[in-house]
Amino acid sequence: MNIKKKSFLFQFLFGWIVLSSAQWLSVLDEAENLNSSFSLESVDSFAPVRPRFIIDEDFAEDYNLTVDILHRPLQENFDSFFPNVEAYVESGNSNGDLMSDNGKLDDLNSRAAYSALKALQNSYGSSHLYRFTPYELFGQSIWIEEAPEVNHVGWSIMFDNLGRYFLLELRGLREVTFALFITFSIVPIITGILTVYIYKKKYCVIKFNKSGRSKKKDSWLKRSKDELLRTDSANLLTLNDNDEPVMIRHSCKRTCILFATLEYNIPEWNIKIKIGGLGVMAELMSKTLKQYDLVWVVPCVGDITYPVAETAPSLVVKVVNQDYEVKVFYHYKDNIKYVLLDSPIFRKRTSHDPYPPRMDDISSAIFYSVWNQSIAAIIRREKVDIYHINDYHGALAPIYNLPEVIPCAISLHNAEFQGLWPLQSSIDEREVCGLFNVSKTICREYIQFGNAFNLMHCGVSYVRRHQSGYGVVGVSNKYGQRSWVRYPVFWSLKKIGQLPNPDPTDIGLSVNPVNQQLPDFAEYASVRKENKRKAQEWAGLTIDDEADLLVFVGRWSVQKGIDILADLAPTLLEKFNIQLIVVGPLIDLYGKFAAEKFMYIMERYPGRVFSKPEFVHLPPFIFEGADFALIPSRDEPFGLVAVEFGRRGAICIGSRVGGLGEMPGWWYSVESSSTAYLLKQLEKSCTLALKSTPEMRHKLRIAALQQRFPVDEWVALYDRLIRNCIKAHNKQQQRRSIKSFFSCITPNKPTKDVNDILSEKSAFSPADYEHSIDIREHTSYDANSMDNDSDEDNYEQAESIISSLSSSALSELSYISESSMNIGSRLDERFIDANGVAIRDFSAELTYLTPENSKGKLSIDHFLNKVQSRWHDEEHHYYKTGFRKRVYKYLKIKDKKSKDVDPDDDLVNQLPLNAYTKPRYKSAASTRLNIYQRILYLKVFTWPLYTIFLSLGQILSISSFQLSLLSGFEDNNQISLYVITGVFILSTIVWWGLYRNLPSVHSLSLPFAVYALAFLFTGISSMSLPYHIRGWLSYAATWVYAIAAASGPLYFTLNFEDEHCSGLGSSITRACVLQGVQQLWLSFLWLWGTLSSRLDYNYKVLLQPINSVYVVAGVWPVSFVLLSVCILLYKGLPPFYRQKPGSIPAFSKSLLHRKVVICFLISVINQNFWMSTLISQAWRFFWGSKLTKLWKIVVMTVSFLVGAWLIIFYVLRKLSNKHTWMVPVLGLGFGAIKWMHVFWGTSNVGIFLPWAGIAGPYLSRALWLWLGILDSIQGIGNGLILLQTLSRRHVTNTLMISQLAGSATSILARFVSPTKTGPANVFPDLTGYTPVDRAKPVANAPFWICLILNVALCIMYLRCYHRENISRP
């Protein structure tokens, strides 16, 4: 839906509801007024009805009485009167003065005017004034019998203190109220749509790069090689400007670097194991880092026969407390020492598949445990200077040598994969730690992240603790920063650096490329034409010089966007004369479906498409003959393919993510992760490229040929990285030494260091798999050959021991980095189409393939999401409910005969940790879950029953901004507010503590018991008891309710955690449904509070206990239901909510490193400081008017909060299916919408609309409801921002902290805020404005500070959202 249609829809929606409601209700009012006891013949038809003035509270305090600050009853026994505006009273005015110096009371309709009236009364049309006591005036009203002109809003009163009389002066302009009404109605919509438009134009663009890398990035070419590689003349190295220098001693010894990779090459043995960028960079390191001594640790794979090599003492590692031998062989080449590790677990891998297929099962745990322990032993044996870690595979190795530490550098080639195993219980922790041979203490201090054993986090923790966080780099200029933004494991670091990969073929420093001789156009075109023909012949395509040759080379996976290319291919083939070559190895299910689709496309377009889903060594003419290189990656750390094609003259078309976008070509931004958006962006880019002129293409190719990604630049940056890592390590060691020295001096202040951690008792005793970290060398080895035979018995023994593990699959968890949102509608890893039904269905439907449905119904992502939804539904029934039999189409069921499964089978290796150790039988649900859990898993409209109950907890809760709802509903009840806020703060701390220390089932079920107690007290307070007892019970009910309401953030963040993510659309659906219901609930709570407020005999406002059996009959069943929900949740919440809370080292530090958290906290504090004291008055404006009928306001409320909300919800969901950023950006685009909402309800502007006639009160409240809806949309957007920028654990803690800060700010606002006693000049009353006043009403600092802060925070929040959004690459 485009912007114009969206704007029209919002304006039409608002206009239709407001005008129709106002006109309909005004007709009813007009009919009733005709039968009233007074005459309207002399009253202008545009004037409001029922005026009155109310005396000031300050004057009443002189008589130890408090006047009625609610709406006073009116006297209707006058035949004629001036129908003026309804008035409110505040305890004070903006400046503390009751009257101006000239005796003039300005602004009849302002709060100051009502406060200044004192006890003055007009006696039967005379202007003479009399003074009465407040008690005598109770129930009285002041009447002005002359109406103002239609162009004015009210009167100003002139007092004569000596003569004791007053004069009236016309004040206010109806044009002002009309302008404010139109502004508040339309401006938020206009600014919201304008913000969306600007955001889309700025970020959702296709960048045409016609020159390649920026001049700044190529500035190194102006320097000589000596300057580039020259080390500092001094003995000092620097990390930061404010760091103290650390001396590095010169040594003749060359720096020794150890790195370990699963991809490697040994040229003299003709061995090359390489599938990606990591293998390329490992090979480059071995060729170019001649100034270092390199120790390269590699495993032996099963399909390669290795020559005889030098043998070395074997290593003995532990797996589940069992010794396991790893043989070691050495091979030397120049400055490289190859360390080859030989063991059965490594031999199971092949040269084409060196990595374990999963990283959350038993086989992979054994693999990486043996791998990392072996690396640790080699580090200790070789005495290296620094260990270079590549990705997560070897990140665990350094902790095995603690307390000895070594400098480390970490290169992130693909940070999305981190090496994860579940730690959902103490049993999981014991078994996984046993697999990896680490103690529980080390696991918690270094490795554990949430409820996962995270290898990448181990490396990050090691660098953070021992190098002050320095040493982690990305492989491109942007990838490091984006990795820091997207993955929570890096948030404890201040930043991630950059070490951009080079082009391995760009060897040597050449002259400035501008001075290079450019090829002749005709000659170059002839060479390209010949190479293009060779490429067409190689691929079996039709020889066609006029056809544009498009090439895709890469892994066939969702990350590389192969499904997007397959969906778009029919459209491109129909519209343009193109040929397509698509090659690369299959990786995941998306690649499998893309291969099936390309097979059909090849048959449909013979001679135009070549598809080969396997790893292929491409000849050079493929790169040199391609017209365009297609790179539709959803995420790309570096993008070596773009460099390889671009530097050979191909023009690039692809996504501008990670390291992509620096070569000449068309690059589209990936602001949204939805497939529909990516398809549209790729189609636009291809269209622009294919329609470009030959001259433009030649210029782009020439620019591409000049691009430089020199190896020498990378070597210089690598040198700096190594030096600084060693410096950071030495500096941290000095700090620890100083710290240890002072610890010895002051033993009363012990510090916990690595030695202390290791000295603690391990979790694994001999009787309970306890062990010390032990990696021993074994000397029994074959000294003559390097064969494939090894200690199979040991390995089989280890496998037999660990086969009893029963941990759940990590894919069921979503707390790590919300990775299910990182690539949009990404398929869950557990669905592998095991029975092949999905691929057969897809193949059958391809017979109806067209260019249109290829991007819609037959889109790979769309089809797999539909299948996945069906598969999850079948799995949900089979494993979680199973109350009735049904036929399963996509779920593969194992029978009892499948108990013994071969662990070597590829399918088994892709199953969760407990998939084959505990086979699932036919009665899976009844054997795994109790009856309560099965009941709560039953679905109601796709929502499991437990999610509905948890949603109820969110609906019943209130925020710190709404605390005055429970404080007696009136501003003068300060003590009640302080008590409520104090209870709310303490309760927040209690619920937060339960969440962090106990399984979440406790913090999610117990609040319902507290809610039940609150409703029980409410019922008791309505019984025939002494008045003071019922009053205290009413207050007790509110206090108890506040205790339960403080748990609200937990229900927001923890709900739906056990359900599989269905994309952002489902999140918006849930948010809109819950927000709509919560709005209704809060609205009627405010109505209840307004109606139940009363005066005692001293005219003090109290919460009136209603003595009625109907109240008991209504609230006690609710209390019983809530108590039942508590019991059901405690017994029936899914196993996910029963796992122990996981720890995250340096969690507070990581939270404060996120700017969106800081911005959110400031926003909450700002709102509570300026507006929390006024929320009750705003709701009094809505519900408490005497100018409206209550039932009509109820109808209007339901119409807006149900009817209008459903329409808005439908529109927002549709828009978010394509643009995942739409709702957050639209909400922030509304600007200071909460400020407008409070302004309209508290500044008297909404009380009297002279241009609207008797429909004015309803029209005014319709606008207030509309502003409330827009405020709710902004609130939903803010919630989505938190979910799209933080992990759920971070969101929970952020909301808890903000709740505490907001509550404390609410109390502070009652003392120091300019709005502590009323709107004051922060929300000035403009109803008395005249041109003579000029800018006086708004010429005050608090007004502008409040307004500017609210607008500025929206802008800041939007910038933080764009920069820290983890749902985009």
From Swiss-Prot:
Q: What class of enzyme is it?
A: transferase
Instruction: State if Metal-binding is listed as a keyword.
Output: no
| Reactions catalysed, as given in the entry | [(1->3)-alpha-D-glucosyl](n) + UDP-alpha-D-glucose = [(1->3)-alpha-D-glucosyl](n+1) + UDP + H(+)
One example of a Gene Ontology biological process annotation: fungal-type cell wall (1->3)-alpha-glucan biosynthetic process
- Tell me which residues bear Phosphoserine: S219
Q: Name one GO cellular component term.
A: ascospore wall
Pfam families according to UniProt: Glyco_transf_5 (PF08323), Glycos_transf_1 (PF00534)
Q: What is this protein called?
A: Cell wall alpha-1,3-glucan synthase mok14
